[in-house]
Amino acid sequence: PYYSLMAYKNLIAPLFSPRARKMIGGGLGDRSALAVDILEEVGFERDARVPYKPAGNLPLGYLKRLELARCIALKSDVMICDEVFSGLGAAEISSLFPLLARLNREGVTLIMIEHRLKELFRIANRVIVLHYGEKLFDGSPEEALKNEAVKEAYFGKGKEARL
């Protein structure tokens, strides 16, 4: 994000992208209101004036939501989420699930790079496991948890293995 800009202003540029412009039309004022609406949709509290705070003053959970909001503003068909759960507490992670699930239901393909497997497996319908740059597994989360090569690569072998 642009840390010196207010959170909602981080969405103005994506809302002027050719793709978004074709879909929504309107002028700058319309886009400002739409930016605040999108931020509210991803969990920014309008009443607490969070959309009007500089992005650099926001906690990590809000910064991650801001990045998701920027993708929503672009009307992306595919979103690559790199460690979206990293650094977040259980409550923050839980609050992201409905948003990610809704985006997926609406046709957005989510490609997630994530080491927090427990959380990832709650939302994923397909998992590709890489180990040292090589594809180790491709299948459902349930199958991944049963796969011996995946368990050994990510959880260790024998006594040190933990899920």
Question: Could you tell me what each predicted segment is?
Answer:
Residues S4-A20:
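Q-loop/switch helix immediately C-terminal to the Walker
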Residues E114-H115:
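H-loop/switch region of ABC-family ATPase nucleotide-binding domains
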Residues M79-D82:
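Catalytic Walker B motif of ABC-type/P-loop ATPase nucleotide-binding domains
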Residues L120-R122:
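A short, surface-exposed alpha-helical micro-motif characterized by mixed small hydrophobic
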